[in-house]
Amino acid sequence: MAKIDLSKYGITGATEIVYNPSYELLFEEETKSTNEGYEVGKESELGAVDVMTGIYTGRSPKDKYIVVDENSKDTVWWTSDEYKNDNHPMSEDVWAKVKDIAKAELSNKKLFVVDAFCGANKDTRMAVRFIVEVAWQAHFVTNMFIKPTAEELENFEPDFVVYNASKAKVENYAELGLNSETCVAFNITSHEQVIINTWYGGEMKKGMFSMMNYYLPLKGIASMHCSANTDKNGENTAIFFGLSGTGKTTLSTDPKRLLIGDDEHGWDDNGVFNFEGGCYAKVINLDKDSEPDIYNAIKRNALLENVTLDENGKIDFADKSVTENTRVSYPINHIENIVRPISSAPAAKNVIFLSADAFGVLPPVSILTPEQTQYYFLSGFTAKLAGTERGITEPTPTFSACFGQAFLELHPTKYAAELVKKMEKSGAKAYLVNTGWNGTGKRISIKDTRGIIDAILSGAINTAPTKKIPMFNFEVPTELPGVDPAILDPRDTYADASEWETKAKDLAARFNKNFVKYTGNEAGKALVAAGPQL
């Protein structure tokens, strides 16, 4: 192992450097009685350690910055008054000051340094060095990223360095023109990330995802916020795009298939590959019987976040008093059915967009044309039901470009173009699957959704009789094995079909209004015809 010298990063006086600690050592460090505040880890009844992340129980998008310089100024998709996103500009001068705060915080301390890879493909992976002062943060990245072999560690040269100074604050933030004492900043030229005043583990995970989303498409590789799996022969690859709560993790974790990964993937000339070495699953209301794979992954070496334990370490998965965003990170080998030894598979044959439509308009499955594929990918639609106390309240739509707008560093059309190129080359087909509601006022059953996914993956959908749905011009099957035929045309689920039409007009208008932002260039204008026609 190379001797770790942190002085080249401006971090001096380290009292001890714990390098790539083992799980045994991490457990010992996390559960030490001398730990204070959010350093404290508690052992749960299942063997996994539970930690709290303080006021930040999710990412802090208003505090995300990218340094504006020669390399980034014309490539990054910057936020603007007209179209807001999370890529806020930061000057090189402010970056230097923020980095100084992190360096000062990390100097003269006991530190943990974890070297790991982001990306299962050796040609394009990013070697990342994480410098942290909290044991469980080292545990988190050990779970979530890909472990180098002993040989790879011998000559490990980081492509990217992450400084996690979660205990520090940007006290002079107003003077620096920042949003708050919290700062998550990226420098694309120096290949560095600085994290200040947030303990949320996901900032390190999604930070590196954002950087892969910057570098890979510029090399002609599709970078995707999706889950992916393949058949037992490792041949029939499928990818599942979808926003939080649409079923990405649940539907890709399938006992009949092998999981490639549950959240972040690339697609190059060799096929689809995972960026990660672990999974970061939501555990609110986790039920042992309906999600056994995730439940069984919660054991020693897994790390729970913001989950409530009693004094005996008993977990209450239903308790959302800290946050609804309770999570667990675990190494991917905690799931039995995974692609081994490398999380990759050939090019995808099927691309599935998951939308949970609370308006009750979209069919449970639509077969998309290439133009519709781009349109619905750029739209990135899902909808939640706000406050479903009694009866259905107002659905709130979310349009998140490429089903992952928060992590896009380039213009969304770049990601759409790369995806379409890869799909054309492999002959992949795309489907829009609604895991949300229909005219019955109930959510489409997971049994029917799984039947739909099975029909897509087996190819049965390609020989099914179809019809066209008006307004959206969707081609939908009229029968599929194992699926209730009465739900396939959403109009049939309403007592009065005109009610569907009223809701469909409303939703179609929302799609059209959202898509205006992509019509600034010819490629975007050409796709308008693939959207709903009123």
UniProtKB/Swiss-Prot annotation:
Pathway annotation: Carbohydrate biosynthesis; gluconeogenesis
Ligand binding (substrate): 59, 200, 206, 327
Coiled-coil ranges (or none): none
Names of required cofactors: Mn(2+)
Enzyme class (EC, first level): lyase
PROSITE patterns: PEPCK_ATP (PS00532)
EC number(s) stated in the UniProt entry for this protein: 4.1.1.49
Domain of life: Bacteria
Gene Ontology terms describing biological process: gluconeogenesis
Residues that coordinate or bind Mn(2+): 206, 225, 263
GO cellular component terms attached to this protein's record: cytosol
Cofactor binding, note field: Binds 1 Mn(2+) ion per subunit.
Keywords on record: ATP-binding, Cytoplasm, Decarboxylase, Gluconeogenesis, Lyase, Manganese, Metal-binding, Nucleotide-binding
InterPro entries, per the entry: PEP_carboxykinase_ATP, PEP_carboxykinase_C, PEP_carboxykinase_N, PEPCK_ATP_CS
Protein function: Involved in the gluconeogenesis. Catalyzes the conversion of oxaloacetate (OAA) to phosphoenolpyruvate (PEP) through direct phosphoryl transfer between the nucleoside triphosphate and OAA.
Family label: Belongs to the phosphoenolpyruvate carboxykinase (ATP) family.
This protein's name: Phosphoenolpyruvate carboxykinase (ATP)
Native source organism of the sequence: Lachnospira eligens (strain ATCC 27750 / DSM 3376 / VPI C15-48 / C15-B4) (Eubacterium eligens)
